[in-house]
Amino acid sequence: MYSVSPTQTELFHLRLLLLTVKGATSFNDLRTVNGEVYQSFSAACLALGLIENDDEWRRAMNEAAEWMMPRQLRRLFVRILLHCQPLHPEELWENFKVAMSEDYSRHFGILQGQQKAYAQIGTMLIAEGKSFTDFPQMEQLIGNYEEENYITLEDAMEIGTKQYKQLNNKQKVIVDLILNRLDNINHNSNCFYIDGPGGSGTAATLLPAGKTVHKTFGLPVSLFADSSSSIKIQSKEAQYLRETDIFIWDEAPMAPRYALEIIGRTLRDIMNNNLPFGGKIIILGGDFRQLLPIKLHGTRSEIVNLSIKFSYVWKYFTSFSLSKNMRVLPEENEFAKFLLNMGDGVLNDSNDNVHLPDNCIASINANIAEDIYDELIRNKEFNKMAKCAILSARNKDVDEINIQVVELLDTLEERIYTSIDSTENCSDNDEINEVILPEYLNSLSPSSLPPYKLRLKPNCIVMLIRNLSINEGLCNGTRLIIIELADHLLKCKILTGDKVGDIVFLNRITLYCENVYPFTFKRRQFPIKLAFAMTINKSQGQTFDKIGIDLRKDVFNHGQLYVGFSR
């Protein structure tokens, strides 16, 4: 098919329709969407969601107004502000302010109800690190934000006391020491590392009100030795860090040492002293048997050197080790010992291979997708299915297995969602936009983005690939099961974290991929991937009732086999 420049508006959109619409026999057919004939090819493309404008968000809010309670609708509006860059957010508020404020309006009247709903939207933005000042088109509020329902001190004390009673003796020794240090600050040694082999602690995804390290300390996405925090000394973020007594960082061994060093410098600057980490109590948790930091095309020695153990601040840490596996039954102790030996390298032969027990190995003709999921799907045991996973070392193998599992589900309610793909930062060579065809962009599938075509069915297991709202439990790596499919929204149930069981609604957002192509690649799509199967790296920190591990191709990183077997 001939290429057409985007400057030839109608011809460009005609070409886009010819690539998308199946079975059309006339121009009228191409301009018909859901029974309505549009006046132009560009209008038909808009109706099909093939090109960008704010109508996507208006339609999503329209669908949401039928499904959601007002508070959920406000959360969706905040998510659109944060992740979708609407051109006219003030119009979106005006169009849906009645629906977003119904709960308040019943008690306070329409005008005051809308004011309170708007104030709570401001509070939600602040909780995500933004405010109305980041959206100058919106009416600005000075103070008077609606308070969120935070946990009380009494409730926190009750929860803490209950959890303390559940600790084993080794855990109590560590907790008592740290609590004592909190009451009697010793400026020389306030840093602790707790080594926890798989199953010896609590999964970090189960801990409430957590935040990512990058967001808490203002770390850049790409970390280097000379990177610095974005937090300003006089900012509210700095004041939050100043008032925090203890920082607990789980899965710390996965982070590059630069992250730990930046945090140390940032806390010293904020506390205005030269003490390690500004004198704060720092608790790192993790397991060096698991995955180490990722360095693209890095050698073995470069990856090891990137570990926090090789940082100049590691000397300030006192190490403890937990050994009792809290997840296994007494009859599984032998397997727990096998796991520990695998992680410690005891099982490796002279070629660094591990010989697995025969009872762990499937027959050569086995189909891993059917073995794990087929019976559960046929019996409609979707809750059990949600507690299973297939793990593989490579994204390509994961994608193939996910396609196989989706085939096992009922096809009657299947929907295919296509993305809108474009480029940015092409100003150095304006002609690039003339050369790049839409179908070329559609063919790109970087691992950091969802696919161009998302083929979904009810009861599909999916995983978020972006942090949408930590307060809602919508973090990168959160698994969900799809309940219902609409044109612009997905109704899902959360399967992991402290928000397990919550019903949430996902909309398309704008995602970016940088430093992979000669341009910034932009894709508007639901921020999810199928997750019947996932990479071993993505599974770290999660727990399943049943797993299958695809080892048709060898693992290639330190800790991958150990992580896979300890899920």
Residue ranges, per PLM feature:
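Long, low-complexity, charged/polar intrinsically disordered accessory regions
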Residues: 1-137
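RecA-like helicase/translocase P-loop NTPase motor core
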Residues: 1-2, 7-10, 24-52, 130-567
